[in-house]
Amino acid sequence: MEDVFWGLMIPLLGTTLGAACVFFMQGRLHRSVQRGLTGFASGVMVAASFFSLLLPALEQSAPMGRWAFLPAVIGFGVGVAFLLFLDHIIPHLHMNAETAEGPRSRLKKTTMLILAVTLHNIPEGMAVGVVYAGVLAGSSGLTAAGAMALSAGIAIQNFPEGAIISMPLKASGMGSWKSFFGGFLSGVVEPVGAVLTILLTSLVVPLLPCFLSFAAGAMIYVVVEELIPEMSAGEHSDIGVVSFAVGFMVMMALDVALG
């Protein structure tokens, strides 16, 4: 159980260390740096969705024969729909955006910025939680090392996210500690979501392939709806694409080497 605890907390550690950059760096991150970090995070999330979630889901559904794709397809679709639903009911503001999404709200821009990253982190916490739930249930295709690889990959891409959220908060006039706390707070949802997912999945172990693909669908939604537009906005640049490839390769290597 100690390994599970650390596996759930490592992603939050990545966010916390990234948010701590606010104490050592001044001003906003350069636009090209933001693009690079966002592209890297996108690559990690896409690779994690495929290698750590969808592939195990398909492997566990193999006894269904020609219908083995059904749990993965259904779970993936429901995961996308779930994030789409949250996107419409939670007021939030994406990085470098002028207008907020979701219902009208009197919340401060800084609060809605934190909500945007928190919304982004929900599927990451679910992904870690559902993989560890599979490990605890002894499901085939899921190992403790593979689960730790996913946690490490999420933590790596959480580091730049922590900086991306805390530094604009400080640049907007917020104090260093409050900015750090804002970045940290956006990542707290991950271990909370992971624990809730473990508890829920443990009740319906036969549906694990659906839960795995659900988390994958939610993560892909975040990448397509939020991260890819952010890394491609403004003047043309290859930084986002190259960083995406690097992030994908890093996560793929982690999953294969440790999984």
Where do the PLM segments sit?
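Intrinsically disordered, metal-sensing/regulatory segments
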Residues: M1-G259
